[in-house]
Amino acid sequence: MFSNSKKKIFLYVLIAGVATFSFAFLVLNRLQAEEHSLAYVENLFLDPFIKQNESLAHANDRPFKLYLGIFSQAKNVDRRNFLRTDYNEYIKEFAVNDTVDVRFILGLPENEQELATIREEQRTYGDLAVLPIPENVDAGKSIVYFQTFLEGYQPFPLFSELADNLIMPSTQFHGSFIYNQSIKTYELPGMKEFQDLGEPKHDYDFIVKADDDSFLNLPRLFEMLKEHVGKSRFYFGRDCTRRELPTAVRDFPYMCGFFYIVSPDMAYEVAKRRNIIIPFEDAQTGYSIYLSGNVKNAEFSKCTLYDLILPNEGFNYRQSYLRIDAIAVHKLKSIPLLSTVSNWFKKMYEHRANCSALIETERLSCLQATIPLPSLDV
């Protein structure tokens, strides 16, 4: 009888011990899961945006040189003024140890008023790059842009008297396929034509082509570029497809034209092919890179490069709502819309900066919160 009682007591103690151990194990796992969750959210949202000192200290290890070419037109003065102010603020704060040169890329002016406007703007800011080609989207502007990164290229002499008479209407293709049309450029005396230019210059690690109706989330862009410093044959963007392309060229990969990045050697591959094969700028760029052969560092991104979902604009597979990890948000055709998107990102960064001052248990909930999406009826 006594022996059975001892067995029962031992069994109860054993069960209690196992239960206690299991409970402790579950609690410990829960705490570890919360720590991992917090670390994940911090990595996603805080670095490098909030932990600025740590981020900038890390930036000392891998400084980069970036040419940020924003494709614009002479008439888009207000858009350039907005982007110039906004981007320079981010560059001063988040690229302290890096080189970031912002330039607005223009074709030739269409009339004397445009010439006077861009001359005054250049006197004030000095950040315009005029190309010796009529203003266009798909008729060779990008190809000529990339030739500016070759040895021997001389900038267009905007203030020369010779430029007074170089007024040309914009040119566009209208949907028909152009299988072999040569680019015609209008170099002024002192400028070399393409065939007289040399090898790629390596003044920059990265060369960006972006449209002025896109907002670039520069802190996120800078963070991403740190991972690719020193890479050659680099091509980054959102992969696109066009059903309009003929079957023979439909399957090669290319990046959507509103934002992509190349290394200097890839810029040369685009610039040296002077004949337009495909009447879509982004597809022509991708095709030239494809023909070059070994593109060993092609990086495709979908979620961080997108068209903004807007009211009454229909839907396409490239669209998304605003998200903090975006690199480029496209289809911002008005200054109020650009301003709305820019302000949303600034408020999100401010909110997450405030989160960093909280204790860990409160910080997670703070980071999971988001600033309400703004009204986009602008």
Curated annotation (Swiss-Prot):
Entry GO MF terms: galactosylxylosylprotein 3-beta-galactosyltransferase activity
Gene: pvg3
Glycosylation (residues): 53, 97, 180, 354
TM region positions: 9-29
Keywords, in A-Z order: Cell wall biogenesis/degradation, Endoplasmic reticulum, Glycoprotein, Glycosyltransferase, Golgi apparatus, Meiosis, Membrane, Signal-anchor, Transferase, Transmembrane, Transmembrane helix
The protein's name in its UniProt record: Beta-1,3-galactosyltransferase pvg3
Main location (coarse class): endoplasmic reticulum
Cell compartment(s), UniProt: Endoplasmic reticulum membrane; Golgi apparatus, Golgi stack membrane
Family: Belongs to the glycosyltransferase 31 family.
Topological domains, Lumenal: 30-378
Species for this entry: Schizosaccharomyces pombe (strain 972 / ATCC 24843)
Topological domain spans for side Cytoplasmic: 1-8
EC number per UniProt: 2.4.1.134
Protein's GO biological process: 4,6-pyruvylated galactose residue biosynthetic process; cell wall organization; meiotic cell cycle; protein glycosylation
Gene3D superfamilies hit by this protein: 3.90.550.50
Membrane topology category: Single-pass type II membrane protein
Described purpose of this protein according to its UniProt entry: Involved in cell wall biogenesis. Has a role in the addition of Gal-beta1,3 moeities to galactomannans and their subsequent pyruvylation. Has a role in meiosis.
Catalytic activity: 3-O-(beta-D-galactosyl-(1->4)-beta-D-xylosyl)-L-seryl-[protein] + UDP-alpha-D-galactose = 3-O-(beta-D-galactosyl-(1->3)-beta-D-galactosyl-(1->4)-beta-D-xylosyl)-L-seryl-[protein] + UDP + H(+)
Gene Ontology cellular-component terms listed: endoplasmic reticulum membrane; Golgi apparatus; Golgi cisterna membrane
Top-rank taxon, per record: Eukaryota
